[in-house]
Swiss-Prot record:
Taxonomic source organism: Candida albicans (strain SC5314 / ATCC MYA-2876) (Yeast)
Assembly behavior: Heterodimer of an alpha and a beta subunit.
Family, similarity comment: Belongs to the F-actin-capping protein alpha subunit family.
Gene Ontology cellular component list: actin cortical patch; cellular bud tip; cortical cytoskeleton; F-actin capping protein complex; incipient cellular bud site; mitotic actomyosin contractile ring
Pfam families: F-actin_cap_A
Main location group: cytoplasm
Protein name: F-actin-capping protein subunit alpha
GO terms assigned for molecular function: actin filament binding
Amino acid sequence: MSINLNELVDSLIQSAPPAELKQVSQSLSSLTKGTSTSSTNSLIQDSIEQYAQENIISIDNIIISKYNKDENSSKYIDYVNNKLFNVDWQNQKIIDVESYHDNNNKRGSNYDELIQKLSQYGDDYYPSNFAFTVIPESEDQLRVIIIGQRANHDNFYTGQWKSNYLITEQGIKGNIDLDIHYFEDGNVRLKFNESINSSNNNNNSSTLQSGNLINNASRIVNFINEQENATMVKIIEQFNNLNQKSFKNLRRLLPVTRSKINWGSAIGNYRLGSDVINKK
């Protein structure tokens, strides 16, 4: 079965961990040097932009997704800082920044307060690189996107926590995604997804019992905090269960010989003991 270059490049980029897009892009550019450079670079950049729009990424602590794409240009909107910007996809940099003015006036009365509380929430609970945005999709609908990302290529690991919440008067729903990649002398990747819906009994929070949710920043952030804490506990419990049960059963048990080791003068008779004695 044959596969063309376009399909191969797109497949490799779409399967890349979110914190490694720059490295994947550079590797693909090096591997495809024998082809038409301009067309290949354009293909790589188009694939990365498609990845960003569908999966949501952050560059320089700014969110990039299909949700904050400007309808009238090729740029994206940074609602938190009121900026329009382009992206150098291959080098993963924000470029061509200009001021943005929201002429649609979809932001509610609590918008600035919500920005402030989410910023404080990130400082309190995210020790890694933190990015967020609040997208006013209509007068009675907000989208909150949060990304916590850590990349340590020297120690062979990257990871991203991504939360995407849709907030309406009826409640809050969304998803939490975790993507961790460890690649020292191997290739191990963990992907986790948790759906959030305030209307479900299991996720129903006391912070959402009264009305006027869309204009109450404190209740929105408190709900997000509760759900993310609960998800973190769930992940830790699953890790412990995996380690104590599934992985433990894979370990090779040592045979029980019931023989005693003489830790006195006879220790030199054992291979390890003789090696230690001879090296003195």
